[in-house]
Amino acid sequence: MMTSWSDRLQNAADVPANMDKHALKKYRREAYHRVFVNRSLAMEKIKCFGFDMDYTLAVYKSPEYESLGFELTVERLVSIGYPQELLNFAYDSTFPTRGLVFDTLYGNLLKVDAYGNLLVCAHGFNFIRGPETREQYPNKFIQRDDTERFYILNTLFNLPETYLLACLVDFFTNCPRYTSCDTGFKDGDLFMSYRSMFQDVRDAVDWVHYKGSLKEKTVENLEKYVVKDGKLPLLLSRMKEVGKVFLATNSDYKYTDKIMTYLFDFPHGPKPGSSHRPWQSYFDLILVDARKPLFFGEGTVLRQVDTKTGKLKIGTYTGPLQHGIVYSGGSSDTICDLLGAKGKDILYIGDHIFGDILKSKKRQGWRTFLVIPELAQELHVWTDKSSLFEELQSLDIFLAELYKHLDSSSNERPDISSIQRRIKKVTHDMDMCYGMMGSLFRSGSRQTLFASQVMRYADLYAASFINLLYYPFSYLFRAAHVLMPHESTVEHTHVDINEMESPLATRNRTSVDFKDTDYKRHQLTRSISEIKPPNLFPLAPQEITHCHDEDDDEEEEEEE
């Protein structure tokens, strides 16, 4: 006879003794199937599942798709007057990573932390460090809010652009035909600033995406450029059984239809043996031309799409939600109205940390799931190169040993130079395992700007949303404790504290002598017996009053 969890938890004192770290690990899914949690989320509270298309439902193959975008953008630049020699460049996926910042003044690609501190600085293909960096960034720091100067390359679509900017800066800096300047380059009497060059690249990228042949070439060879996953119909059909499913993409209907038709092009339906279904049947609401992030604010006029021609019907759509209708434009408020849902009822799944995740979280309160395809490689390095991480920990222990018996009275200065050199070498080797710009999430022990944005705005994240297939829809995604240094480096063992040295350490904040408190209160009230006094002493809460998790609101449960 099996014992229920509620029975097993009656004696809660037994749980910690039996549930050590190794025991916890056996309940976790495989790393490549995991969904990672920043803020707790109860799946049973989710009533609507929303999807972006590009790089979410439709994952583009890397580096094939980035190479195509790179080539088309270079061709566009050459067509408007840039040197023919640029056509010799080919996309190198080992150089760029997402989340880099381009300095339009000096032409540098920067990797920074959440506060704007420099982690990596590259001028073209030349990595700058030390005194050279301080000439342009005296405090090794940038003002991230100076958006006129600093542009964050945060999306997967930015990867070809990131590498192209490095190619251009390196070419114009080193080509003998041009004279390199601090803020640009000269060709005779002609001066081109890095700001102007950057704007040309931005315009070329937009042209390739909206007027060029990128989408046409993608559709011509879908097998080459788009990942097709047989588990997609199964997951969406299961989602539709427990809630509503919608698609909100910035792409137009014609392109969306071709991509989605390919993604669901299987001889069977959700399961082998079931009949094939058109892709539209997996969604309760389909919305194209969303124009995110504007979509999460005032939005645009809601129109209806003629699915036979791909053109928009005249007039604003004002009717109820109808199955089979494809909408264009609108806003996140429109989605909520049509689906009869409110902010926290919706889990929105996308890859764009600004256009999908940040805006849906800040403006609408939607729950958020960030798709980070690079996470697969990050996890591979984290596990496959564990020896490097372990060596860093050993070096930290060795460093601590050298100082173990020294205090402020010591004149001895241990020689730690060799340890420092080794730490730098191991950290560099670790960084290079990810690529030339290092990890998407860190540089050594310091987290990147991108990592901080993921932690701040994404409730859940994973390499693919398909990982939701491995969790029940009743699952409670619980966030792990985010430990501060004094918590992560101090063991849970009793430490005798000298009260004279640390008087606040033994200050009693948990237990109160209520008899003594009542006596004092009685003494006070006797002296002012004719006045009913206010509460003179706070009482410790006897019920749970603190909010510990994002998704543990008992008031909402009581209302339901």
From Swiss-Prot:
One of its GO terms (molecular function) is GMP 5'-nucleotidase activity. The active site is at 52 (nucleophile), 54 (proton donor). It catalyses: a ribonucleoside 5'-phosphate + H2O = a ribonucleoside + phosphate; a 2'-deoxyribonucleoside + a ribonucleoside 5'-phosphate = a ribonucleoside + a 2'-deoxyribonucleoside 5'-phosphate; IMP + H2O = inosine + phosphate; GMP + H2O = guanosine + phosphate. IMP binds at residues 52, 54, 202, 206, 215, 249-251, 292. One of its GO terms (cellular component) is cytosol. Residues 541-560 are annotated as: Disordered. Optimum pH is 6.5. The modification Phosphoserine is found at residues 418, 502, 511, 527. Its cofactor is Mg(2+). Keywords: Allosteric enzyme, ATP-binding, Cytoplasm, Hydrolase, Magnesium, Metal-binding, Nucleotide metabolism, Nucleotide-binding, Phosphoprotein, Transferase. Residues 548-560 are annotated as: Required for tetramer assembly. Binds 1 Mg(2+) ion per subunit. Residues 550-560 have a biased composition (Acidic residues). GO terms for biological process: adenosine metabolic process; allantoin metabolic process; amide catabolic process; dGMP catabolic process; dGMP metabolic process; GMP catabolic process; GMP catabolic process to guanine; GMP metabolic process. ATP binds at residues 144, 154, 453, 456. Allosterically activated by various compounds including ATP, 2,3-BPG/2,3-Bisphosphoglyceric acid and Ap4A/P1,P4-bis(5'-adenosyl) tetraphosphate. Binding of an allosteric activator is a prerequisiste to magnesium and substrate binding. Inhibited by inorganic phosphate. Its EC number is 3.1.3.5, 3.1.3.99, 2.7.1.77. Homotetramer. Broad specificity cytosolic 5'-nucleotidase that catalyzes the dephosphorylation of 6-hydroxypurine nucleoside 5'-monophosphates. In addition, possesses a phosphotransferase activity by which it can transfer a phosphate from a donor nucleoside monophosphate to an acceptor nucleoside, preferably inosine, deoxyinosine and guanosine. Has the highest activities for IMP and GMP followed by dIMP, dGMP and XMP. Could also catalyze the transfer of phosphates from pyrimidine monophosphates but with lower efficiency. Belongs to the 5'(3')-deoxyribonucleotidase family. This is Cytosolic purine 5'-nucleotidase.
